[in-house]
A protein has these predicted regions:
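Transmembrane alpha-helix segments characteristic
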Residues: 349-378, 439-443
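Transmembrane-lumen/periplasm boundary regions of multi-pass, lipid-linked membrane glycan transferases
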Residues: 259-277
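Membrane-interface micro-motifs in multi-pass membrane enzymes
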Residues: 72, 99, 148-190, 213-215, ...
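Transmembrane alpha-helices and membrane-interface helical segments
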Residues: 137, 184-191, 225-230, 258, ...
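Short hydrophobic alpha-helices at membrane interfaces in multi-pass membrane enzymes
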Residues: 191-209
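Intrinsically disordered, polar/acidic, low-complexity terminal segments
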Residues: 3-97, 101, 106, 110-118, ...
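Central hydrophobic cores of alpha-helical transmembrane segments
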Residues: 150-156, 203-208, 355-363, 436-441
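Transmembrane-embedded, aromatic-rich helix segments that form part
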Residues: 202, 216-234
Length: 658
């Protein structure tokens, strides 16, 4: 209390102030973001890379959302649902590829849902995410955690070459797992070269085996490891060949293990080739080989590496598209590619090895298999615009670009001379950085443009709607409904796939045994149906010519001595394949009648009562003769000759939207 009688605060000791400050700091510690900011600042490159990968996955998920299964996809899925899980199934080659990994994944997936595009896309994107993380991990090990590694990571993430491949599920499940295995094998192999630890060699061998399980191009991964080891993992001497010889000697254990894996795979491949529809053979035209090689480089790989091809040529139906770069941009792209290569070699003489690494992969992994298996059967011009062939080269391109422009992290031992960093050299470095940034921006813009252009000319909606309608039709149709079997649209599955292009496979596998499929309708079939081009189930009708109408008072066409002559209102089409007969069989038991036409006679089973019968014929007819073969009398009311088609004016399952 003061002398005036007023209360005054008690003096606070320094200890109490410190205690108060500590308590306040603890109370507001949750709001202190300094440590978080420091962490992000320290790990900004990794954070930026993760953000890039997340954006890429979202972008590619949106890309996949407008596509659907096509061609090989349906074949692989239907093969999986029909096959037991055994060695014969997983080593089945088919169209020329030993794809054990895909067979296993497809077998498991179809037992969850046969045509589940969402699930299939999720599997593909999971591999994409894993491959991108593997690329980030490898780039950090090779070049350190520096902002520059975001450039090859960006190229790998957005390269349009990979998008058509990703959009076809069977191709994606070959290429993307191979890319993951390649990146992981390179990382483990480099660790082994540097440390000589057995666990790294074991990891590298496992990833080489994984690559082989998913794609025969995995045979080239050990070759890539050898070129990489001899070219960059040891101090370069006089020749690359000499460096590779030294690498062979120093790491002989690795090469022996890789060779054993390759030999074992080749044995399995050779034993499985009898299930392949195509077999390796020497090309019969050097000109076709040259056309393919030049086309794959100038129309697909080089434009794609620079963000192209900028425009596409869609197949009929729009389920896929080939590269169709503008003529002017082809030559601009080639010029830019040459300039980039020359500049990189001028800056780092060893860079030529990096580009040779990329070209070597393209030649060995992407060109040679096509040259020895596809050149004779398909147009070389078309094959040269097939970007799927070089999709697996994108990770090699990203690695090669990094090796061409930057030293390995282990080589950066000397600190830069600050005096030499001034003046002309500093200005040149700044200008080079600006040019490089501009080129990366152009590639980024071109990649987005190219992918959007691909989306504009392709769509999976027709196939998706077809399968959705067919699924609903099978659920709603009575069990045992007779359905005329025919091929699905070639946009979905081409006739080259044989029986796997038939509706009884593509649609029938949705509910095996639910419908009664008829390849060649014959005999008495009431309520015959057909699937229309939209996947809905329609009643079948004959498109052609009808019999002359009954005269007034008649219920049957004239029958003399069990013989009915059916006159049509003109001649049927030249490719007539069937006759439909509406009849009444006057008997208590089934019987047979013969249907005669100029090209032959068909016996047709009939049933008591009012029914519809079909007989297969060949060629144009103007009349047929129906004759009872005993056991009853037949009354023919009407007939048509022509070919079956879906009657889209009648009832439909499921009902079409109004």
């Amino acid at each position: 209390v003061s002398q005036a009688g007023e209360e005054v605060d008690r003096p606070v000791s320094a200890k109490e102030i410190a205690l108060y400050d500590d308590a306040a700091e603890r109370d507001f510690a949750w709001a202190d973001l300094r440590s978080t900011v420091d962490w992000f600042r320290t790990n900004r490159v990794v954070v930026a890379a993760i953000v890039l990968i997340v954006v890429e996955i979202v972008w590619k998920a949106q890309f996949l959302s407008h596509l659907y299964f096509r061609q090989d996809d349906f074949h692989d899925l239907d093969l999986a649902i029909q096959s037991p899980f055994n060695w014969r199934y997983v080593t089945y080659i088919g169209a020329g590829h030993l794809i054990i990994g895909l067979r296993v994944i497809a077998w498991v997936m179809v037992r969850t849902s046969l045509y589940n595009w969402g699930l299939a896309s999720a599997i593909s994107l999971a591999f994409v995410a894993a491959a991108n993380l593997a690329m980030l991990r490898l780039l950090r090990m090779l070049f350190g955690t520096r902002p520059a590694i975001l450039v090859p990571l960006l190229i790998y993430a957005i390269c349009p070459l990979a998008m058509p491949d990703l959009g076809e599920w069977s191709s994606a499940l070959e290429s993307v797992p191979l890319q993951l295995a390649l990146l992981m094998a390179v990382h483990a192999h480099i660790c082994y070269v540097r440390t000589r630890r057995v666990k790294h060699l074991a990891a590298a061998a496992i990833w080489v085996a994984v690559g082989l399980v998913f794609f025969e191009k995995g045979l080239v991964v050990p070759v890539l490891l050898l070129l990489l080891t001899g070219g960059f993992l040891a101090a370069p001497r006089r020749t690359w060949l000499g460096d590779m010889v030294r690498a062979l000697v120093r790491c002989w254990r690795a090469w022996v293990i890789y060779a054993v894996l390759m030999a074992a795979y080749l044995v399995v491949l050779a034993q499985s080739l009898h299930t392949s529809t195509t077999h390796p053979s020497a090309p019969n035209s050097a000109g076709a080989v040259g056309t393919f090689v030049s086309g794959l480089l100038k129309d697909s790989f080089v434009p794609g590496a620079l963000g192209g091809p900028w425009q596409w040529l869609a197949v009929p139906g729009g389920s896929y598209a080939f590269a169709a770069p503008p003529f002017a941009l082809i030559w601009i792209g080639l010029f830019v590619a040459v300039v980039v290569i020359v500049i990189s070699i001028w800056r780092r003489p060893v860079a030529w090895r990096a580009w040779a690494l990329v070209i070597g992969w393209v030649v060995i992994a992407d060109m040679l298999p096509v040259i020895f298996s596809r050149i004779g059967a398909f147009s070389a011009d078309v094959l040269g615009t097939e970007t799927r062939y070089v999709a697996d080269a994108v990770p090699v391109l990203a690695i090669g670009m990094g090796l061409a422009f930057w030293p390995l992290a282990t080589d950066q031992t000397r600190k830069p001379n600050t005096r030499r960093a001034h003046g002309l050299r500093a200005r040149t470095a700044q200008q080079s950085l600006e040019v490089a940034a501009g080129l990366v921006a152009v590639v980024l813009f071109g990649s987005i443009w190219s992918v959007q252009a691909y989306k504009n000319v392709t769509s999976g909606k027709p196939a998706a709607d077809y399968i959705a309608n067919a699924s609903a039709a099978i659920k709603q149709a009575p069990r045992g409904t007779a359905v005329m079997d025919s091929a699905v649209s070639g946009d979905m599955v081409e006739g080259l796939f044989g029986s796997y292009a038939l509706q009884s496979i593509v649609i029938g596998d949705l509910a095996p045994g639910k419908l009664r499929w008829l390849e060649h309708p014959g005999g008495t079939i009431d309520g015959l149906h057909m699937f229309g081009p939209d996947g809905r189930l329609y009643q079948a009708k004959v498109r052609g010519v009808a019999s002359e109408p009954l005269q007034a008072g008649q219920k049957c066409l004239p029958n003399k001595n069990g013989r009915t002559v059916v006159h049509f209102q003109g001649s049927s089409p030249s490719k007539t394949g069937i006759v439909r007969i509406g009849y009444v069989w006057f008997s208590s038991s089934p019987g047979y009648v013969s249907v005669s036409y100029p090209g032959g006679t068909r016996d047709v089973a009939v049933k008591p009562g009012l029914h519809t019968a079909f007989a297969s014929i060949k060629g144009s007819v103007s009349q047929v003769v129906v004759r009872s073969l005993g056991g009853g009398a037949i009354c023919v009311g009407d007939a048509q000759a022509g070919n079956l088609e879906a009657d889209q004016t009648g009832p439909v399952i499921p009902a079409a939207p109004s």
